[in-house]
């Protein structure tokens, strides 16, 4: 018969379970809720932007900096592992900070744990917008992640990108390697794969997760759970409207059918335009002939253009 658990043992097991859950949840923190990507309002210019060490617009320093790792604005002496020891009960402002992250451009407090772990675990390490290719240092807004392909997006492109993200680079939902229906879709490659071709020797499937994409290794999703649409290609007369109003094959057949029933108005207009163009060309030819007759009797004497230049050179 097992021994009965004591109160201290129960507390220790519960503490270990909570710590395990916290460690697992840190890797799945929403990018919009991370302290280094928090929303900040400048004290001087009152413009809202991403959490930064210096204002992106006026370069001023904030009165209460926010730590990019733990998110605190006040360092308590009793409950922290401060690298810089401060004599008071707590410290705020520039007395609390210890470094600036090169990736997220935000302050990191002078706690030993934050200084040693933030640079390696910063979620904005390679944060470059997939649409405009701007990084954290190139614009003042916050960084977001696409909910479909999980690529980085800036504030300007996040809505437009996510509205057009679920579009396949194909005209059908068939697997790119065979002719069967693609049951799994990769939203980064914009391609579908069947069950057989999702098995890859390069990328291994983790337990409890969807199979990875055989091309890029990103986790695929079931096509039936997505609002996927295919790319539509238009050729020839299907491309759109034209200047004369005849767009597409429908308008072409409508014009033919109207000619059969005696509707010749369209052709009458063309004939009138052709006659007007012919009259303009004839008037232009007549005016050119009259101008040439005026200069035929004009005599300018011996000139270089008339061919007498070499005679004048010999005489001199």
Swiss-Prot record:
One annotated Gene Ontology cellular component of this protein: nucleoplasm
Biased composition (Basic and acidic residues): 10-22
Primary location: nucleus
InterPro entries linked: NOA36 (IPR010531)
Keyword Cell inner membrane found: no
Localization of this protein: Nucleus; Nucleus, Nucleolus; Chromosome, Centromere
Top-rank taxon: Eukaryota
Stretches of the chain forming a coiled coil according to its record: none
Keywords: Centromere, Chromosome, Metal-binding, Nucleus, Phosphoprotein, Repeat, Zinc, Zinc-finger
Disulfide bonds: none
Zinc finger (C4-type): 42-58, 67-104, 129-149, 175-189
Compositional bias segments (type: Acidic residues): 268-291
GO terms for MF: zinc ion binding
Motif interval(s): Nuclear localization signal: 3-11
Modified residues (Phosphoserine): 287
Region (Disordered): 1-24, 227-299
Protein family membership: Belongs to the NOA36 family.
Name of the protein this chain belongs to: Zinc finger protein 330
Source species of the chain: Mus musculus
